[in-house]
């Protein structure tokens, strides 16, 4: 007589909520796709639409003469031309809007695979929900601009940076290659995305310095490859910097603008202003509690781990303490540091040279910012 053993897959409440957030996020992405089927655009989007009507050579020439790198426009032109090839008579605006939604589907894949395996599906679901639904971000999901792609490239570079520094990673060099490629893609997409990637590289350097100083040579290799990969655009960048130094449209910053950065990150856009203020305060307090609390627990857990190891009982470390010890929480804190670094760079450049920073230039680093919250 054969007895059939029925295996039951147990899903914790936290994981179930993570999958729920994934489903909600997918529904929001589907809604974003539905919103693409409109020809309504504003001035900056009109610039993109006009740019992709040119050949690739002209497009690169015009972006070099302006203040933008060319990758986003090339990607958008390729997709729009492909749509027109498959569907003769198709317009330009709708396919261009769809291009802006595509990066979030890539982040969906990262959430249910890469993030789920290394952190949890709860972390993946919370991250994806945040980068789609948190203040400011929904407005740029379908906008015909480069911010969604810049956010994808910076976030992916940051994720693979964790693969580089994680002691449990089996193929750190593959993650290093992905870091270089995504970093270059970010630098060729938007300049403050390039700044964000520089902050990611500083994080990797700090992690190597802390873990194994011999790996700093590996970090130097990644940096050298990135510089070589960006050489073709350096002359155009130098001309653009010279142009911006002489004249640019951005208004001067004040120290009150730092508060504006927090409002940009946390303040919703409901019709009730008092409600927006209350929600912004609650969200800010929640973010500080989650990220700050995880750092405090890390310090306590790390100290306890060292005491146990010094006593010769490393085998009794709890799994949570191992996770803290392997740098998960520090990686989460580094996500916040990436955004802070972008803001500090923007303010420093604006005060020392001329104003070059507006709040939306934080968008490329906001994936790292909300990943920090999800990890915490």
Predicted regions span which residues?
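Short, Lys/Arg-rich, polar N-terminal cytosolic tail immediately upstream
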Residues: 1-14, 316
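N-terminal leader/targeting segments
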Residues: 1-4, 165, 169
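Membrane-proximal helix-loop-helix interfaces that form the catalytic/acceptor-binding platform
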Residues: 16, 21-166, 173-376
């Amino acid at each position: 007589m054969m007895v059939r053993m029925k295996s039951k897959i147990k899903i914790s409440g936290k994981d179930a909520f993570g999958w729920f957030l994934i489903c909600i996020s997918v529904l929001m992405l589907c809604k974003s796709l539905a919103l693409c089927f409109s020809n309504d655009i504003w001035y900056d989007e009109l610039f993109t639409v006009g740019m992709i009507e040119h050949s690739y050579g002209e497009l690169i020439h015009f972006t070099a003469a302006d203040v933008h790198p060319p990758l986003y426009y090339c990607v958008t032109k390729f997709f729009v031309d492909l749509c027109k090839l498959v569907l003769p008579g198709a317009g330009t605006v709708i396919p261009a809007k769809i291009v802006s939604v595509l990066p979030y589907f890539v982040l969906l894949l990262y959430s249910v695979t890469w993030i789920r395996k290394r952190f949890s599906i709860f972390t993946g679901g919370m991250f994806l929900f945040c980068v789609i639904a948190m203040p400011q971000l929904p407005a740029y999901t379908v906008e015909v601009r480069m911010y969604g792609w810049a956010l994808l490239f910076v976030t992916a570079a940051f994720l693979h940076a964790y693969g580089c520094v994680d002691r449990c990673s089996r193929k750190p060099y593959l993650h290093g290659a992905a870091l270089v490629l995504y970093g270059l893609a970010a630098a060729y997409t938007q300049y403050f995305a390039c700044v964000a990637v520089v902050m990611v590289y500083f994080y990797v350097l700090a992690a190597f310095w802390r873990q194994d100083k011999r790996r700093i040579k590996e970090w130097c290799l990644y940096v050298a490859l990135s510089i070589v990969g960006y050489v073709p655009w350096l002359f155009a960048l130098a001309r653009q910097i010279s142009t911006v130094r002489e004249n640019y449209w951005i208004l001067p910053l004040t120290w009150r603008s730092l508060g504006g950065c927090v409002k940009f990150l946390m303040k919703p856009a409901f019709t009730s202003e008092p409600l927006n203020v209350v929600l912004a305060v609650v969200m800010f307090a929640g973010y500080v509690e989650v990220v700050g609390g995880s750092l405090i627990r890390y310090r306590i857990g790390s100290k306890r781990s060292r005491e146990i190891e010094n006593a010769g009982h490393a085998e009794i470390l709890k799994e949570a303490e191992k996770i803290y010890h392997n740098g998960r929480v520090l990686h989460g804190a580094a996500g916040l540091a990436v955004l802070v670094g972008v803001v500090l760079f923007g303010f420093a450049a604006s005060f020392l040279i001329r104003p070059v920073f507006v709040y939306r230039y934080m968008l490329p680093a906001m994936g790292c910012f909300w990943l920090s919250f999800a990890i915490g």
